[in-house]
Amino acid sequence: MKAIILAGGHSERFGKAKAFAEIDGQLFYQRIVQTLQETNMFNDIIISTNDQLANQFKHDNVIIDDANNKNKGPLAGIHTVMKQYNDEELFFVISVDTPMVTGKAISALYQFLVSRLIEDQIDIAAYSEHNRVIPTIAFYHPNCINVMDEALASNDYSLRHVYNNVTTECLDVTNIQSPEYWYKNINYQEDLDDLKQQINH
């Protein structure tokens, strides 16, 4: 099973590439890599990014988005990696701007997926908040590839396009009680300031 860290966004709202922002003395991407490694669930951790940022990562496996799908957001990153590893059975996707994700949360979502697979075929198992799917904390099955192809060829290459057209099951974020900020994504510098305050509270 492989993990994909989505780190190719332009981060206009944040002011710089979020992958290299710091929390608790660690860069966001390095913290997530460490969390993923500590789960012992993944045989590979892949950073998905763009050609401008790729050489700034100190990581063994960095994959640049397919040039044909440039500027098509996180879907392009997930699709590029899944196409390269087309014999893999499952991918965990996490956005680099969710630095406090925990191994407990990742493991719980995997257990949720496995328990549902006994009854049904599930293509995406994601977290949700207030019934809103969080597609960047999710497991993706390769069955999604055809719908991803269609989405990238259309004018709607949102992840919503994908999860609405495959079998998606969600686990509410409140199932993981601590820390309460584990799933928060950082869009603005103020979000990072708030997170630091919560951590040090």
Curated annotation (Swiss-Prot):
Q: What is its EC number?
A: 2.7.7.77
Q: Which UniProt keywords apply?
A: Cytoplasm, GTP-binding, Magnesium, Metal-binding, Molybdenum cofactor biosynthesis, Nucleotide-binding, Transferase
Query: Which major enzyme category is it?
Result: transferase
| Main localization (coarse) | cytoplasm
Taxonomy, superkingdom: Bacteria
List cofactor names only: Mg(2+)
Record-listed Mg(2+) binding positions: D97
Task: List GO terms (cellular component aspect).
Answer: cytoplasm
Q: Which reaction does it catalyse?
A: Mo-molybdopterin + GTP + H(+) = Mo-molybdopterin guanine dinucleotide + diphosphate
Q: Name one GO biological process term.
A: Mo-molybdopterin cofactor biosynthetic process
Q: Which residues bind GTP?
A: L6, A7, G8, K18, D65, D97
Q: Where in the cell is it found?
A: Cytoplasm
> Which molecular-function annotation in GO is an example for this chain?
GTP binding
Gene3D superfamilies (alphabetical): Spore Coat Polysaccharide Biosynthesis Protein SpsA, Chain A (3.90.550.10)
Q: What is known of its domains?
A: The N-terminal domain determines nucleotide recognition and specific binding, while the C-terminal domain determines the specific binding to the target protein.
Q: What does this protein do?
A: Transfers a GMP moiety from GTP to Mo-molybdopterin (Mo-MPT) cofactor (Moco or molybdenum cofactor) to form Mo-molybdopterin guanine dinucleotide (Mo-MGD) cofactor.
Q: Which family does it belong to?
A: Belongs to the MobA family.
> Know the name of this protein?
Probable molybdenum cofactor guanylyltransferase
Organism for this UniProt entry? Staphylococcus haemolyticus (strain JCSC1435)
